[in-house]
């Protein structure tokens, strides 16, 4: 969407009726421009109701991202992060990787209402509707090299699960290496990309996408079942408060990883793993699969797979884990 459409969306975000005249006056544009903004919102899949004599309203209120409200919700952690909110970007991860290469400091957060080329793991596209998901990336700098941060993705999963459970998704579980699931489908995902030396100082761009509100178009466009936080919680979710809670949890687990590695978090991760001690199929990069029992993870985040009494270690790479009964 263009800038005018986003301005119009902010004017309507509360879900109340607003006259075209009031919207135009508030934005400093013509009534005709407002009409075009409404048209673009509808074209983007955001349903705007028009009633003669009352004006326009969204069919459901939206919690739009706001840097000021986010900093307020962060409280005593606000100084840790530099917050940037964008209407639209190609990819928050790509943007922060470029910023990392330019020397941007750690603690930089970029959240976007719309990603035009959002990315997930294994090259998959991340699809979301404007205002219905929480998509952001965090740049963090480490004195350690990337080789010593092998368990970072799993630590981030713990932070994500903690925040989502606190927000009402009590049944949120982790799936190795980077997904958060509910019984009804995938709730959130993680994509971590490294910049810097394998042995020396490094930077991680931690990308997270959360399905906050159900969206039929998004569900139809992806090849897996999708869950959402508002359905699980039974209430409308304030995305600014959710992001603040998640950033606080991320700050906590990153501090542990920096000081001690993933090992202190291993037991908690295993307690949240949806396939812990369950029969699974591990899909390997060459297309083959290993059947076995998911018996935990190692201190470096490697999956421990028991097959015929022997335990093997597998790092995430391009591997994919499924329940054994889901494999045909």
Task: Tell me the role of every PLM-derived stretch.
Residues 1-30, 36-39, 43-44, 144-172, ...:
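Long, positively charged amphipathic alpha-helical accessory segments at protein N-termini or as interdomain linkers
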Residues 2-166, 237:
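N-terminal lobe of the biotin/lipoate ligase/transferase fold
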Residues 79, 104-106, 176, 185, ...:
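Short, basic and Ser/Thr-rich N-terminal targeting/leader segments
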Residues 87, 174-176:
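Short loop/edge segments at beta-strand edges and connector loops
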Residues 179:
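Conserved active-site carboxylates
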């Amino acid at each position: 969407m263009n800038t005018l459409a986003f301005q119009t969306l902010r004017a309507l975000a509360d879900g109340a009726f607003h006259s075209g005249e009031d919207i135009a006056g508030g934005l400093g544009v013509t009534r005709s421009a407002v009409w075009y903004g409404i048209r673009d919102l509808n074209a983007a899949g955001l349903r705007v109701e028009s009633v003669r004599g009352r004006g326009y309203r969204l069919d459901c209120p939206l919690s739009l991202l706001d840097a000021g409200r986010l900093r307020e919700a962060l409280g005593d952690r606000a100084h840790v992060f530099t917050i940037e909110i964008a209407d639209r970007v190609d990819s928050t991860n790509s943007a922060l990787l470029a910023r990392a290469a330019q020397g941007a400091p750690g603690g930089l957060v970029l959240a976007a209402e719309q990603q035009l080329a959002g990315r997930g793991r294994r090259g998959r596209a991340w699809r979301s509707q404007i205002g219905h998901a929480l998509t952001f990336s965090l740049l963090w700098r480490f004195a350690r090299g990337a080789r010593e941060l092998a368990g970072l993705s799993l630590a981030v999963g713990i932070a994500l699960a903690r925040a989502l459970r606190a927000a009402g998704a009590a049944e949120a579980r982790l799936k190795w290496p980077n997904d958060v699931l509910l019984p009804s489908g995938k709730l959130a995902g993680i994509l971590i990309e490294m910049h810097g030396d394998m042995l020396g100082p490094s930077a991680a761009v931690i990308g997270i996408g959360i399905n906050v509100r159900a969206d039929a178009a998004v569900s139809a466009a992806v090849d897996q079942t999708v869950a959402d936080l508002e359905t699980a919680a039974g209430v409308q979710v304030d995305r600014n408060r959710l992001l603040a809670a998640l950033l606080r949890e991320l700050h906590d687990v990153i501090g542990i990883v920096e000081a001690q590695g993933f090992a202190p978090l291993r037991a908690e991760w295993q307690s949240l793993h949806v396939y812990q001690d369950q029969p699974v199929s591990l899909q390997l990069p060459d297309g083959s699969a290993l059947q076995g029992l998911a018996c935990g993870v190692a201190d470096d985040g490697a999956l421990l797979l028991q097959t015929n009494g022997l335990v093997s270690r597998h790092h995430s790479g391009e591997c994919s884990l499924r329940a054994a009964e889901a494999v045909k």
